[in-house]
Amino acid sequence: MNTPFFISWRYQRGKQKNPLVALIAKFSAIGIALGVAVLIVGLSAMNGFERELNQRILAVVPHAEILSAPNATEPTIHHWQNLEKRLQQNPQIKGISPFVSFTALVENGSKLKVVQVKGVEKQAEDKVSSIGNFVQEQGWNKFEKEGGLVLGSGIAKELDVKVGDWITLLISQQNGDEQFAQPTREPVQVTSILRLDGQLDYSYALLPLAQAQTFLTYQPDQITGVELKLDDPFSARNLDLSMLNDYPQMLYMQNWISKFGYMYRDIQLIRTVMYIAMVLVIGVACFNIVSTLIMAVKDKQGDIAIMRTLGANNAFIKRIFIWYGLQAGMKGCLIGIVLGIILALNLTTFIQGIEWVIGKKLLSGDVYFVDFLPSELHWLDVLMVLVAALALSLMASLYPASRAAKLQPAQVLSSH
């Protein structure tokens, strides 16, 4: 066994002359453990939010939409099949789905709620999103055949609506002078509930494309726009649409980044801030090791003097106390990693338990894109936290170890 390591290990396990050394060592280990555990849990939560953003937002919302330009004389797109043929020339585009979109007031008795209604074709929509996976009770399979409204679960809860209930859509209409006329009232049956466990549940509803066109008195080839699925969602801003340069209608594109990109930026920003904050916390805890080692050096200076008289050089003495500091840091790291892993793997359940006890949601679904705290443990994060904590422990050990190596054995032994 490495002799300096063995001696430092015996010092760790042996009884200290000064009990304050052991007390400070315990507090430094606790501080490191808490910092490591919190950092692992925090990073796992950020990973969980990123996963849910991919699965519940990017899998549901279109990566890009082609719409009629706001200043165009015609607010809708006619003969959309011609537009589809042109877009298919771009290999970046993996799916195209026509849609009709409008804002309506949902009425159920005396309760009202403003919703964004989108009319889609099931088969085409399946090519651009996974929204069918979030429609409950096999409602997506019956969507096109039976018609009716797929309503967000948050809207259904607020309006006290269940599957099979009839509600009324109040749809505003424009006359030829582009002035709003008396809204039309369209009764429609709720055939299924859409549950994404987040913000979209409180603002989103789906209709079959043909039914939506009928409500708006559109022609069969008349739509609001087309949804696009791209091979790389992050290339949406640089999508090549040169094939539409000579299209007979003014069009424009909007992408998911303009709507939801802030969520990705916020997650990355919080992750960075969390790294900095927790490294500082671990750093403060690690520098308790400085105090521990300085006191340990003073406690063991007689042993150091004896080893120096027996031939131990400066490097030998320095390695003893570097190992001493690393072992103190490793103890806190291991405790923190075990605690952090257990909490990260059970974070969602743990938070749900707290919500059950206090009787309140910590994350409101109508504010955040998910209404629960997700978690996903990445072992690379655990390794990075371990390396960072050990590196800080090593840095904290260097100064006290150097002081131990500079002790003069003659002075120490003469004072004993």
From Swiss-Prot:
Disulfide bonds: none annotated. Its main location: membrane. It is found in: Cell inner membrane. Coiled coil: none annotated. Keywords: Cell inner membrane, Cell membrane, Membrane, Transmembrane, Transmembrane helix, Transport. GO terms for biological process: lipoprotein localization to outer membrane; lipoprotein transport. InterPro entries: ABC3_permease_C, Lipoprotein-release_system, LolCE_TM, LolE_gammaproteobact, MacB_PCD. It is a multi-pass membrane protein. One of its GO terms (cellular component) is plasma membrane protein complex. The chain crosses the membrane at residues 21-41, 276-296, 334-354, 379-399. Pfam families: FtsX, MacB_PCD. Belongs to the ABC-4 integral membrane protein family. LolC/E subfamily. NCBIfam families: lolCE, lolE_release, PRK11146.1. Part of an ATP-dependent transport system LolCDE responsible for the release of lipoproteins targeted to the outer membrane from the inner membrane. Such a release is dependent of the sorting-signal (absence of an Asp at position 2 of the mature lipoprotein) and of LolA. This is Lipoprotein-releasing system transmembrane protein LolE. The gene is lolE.
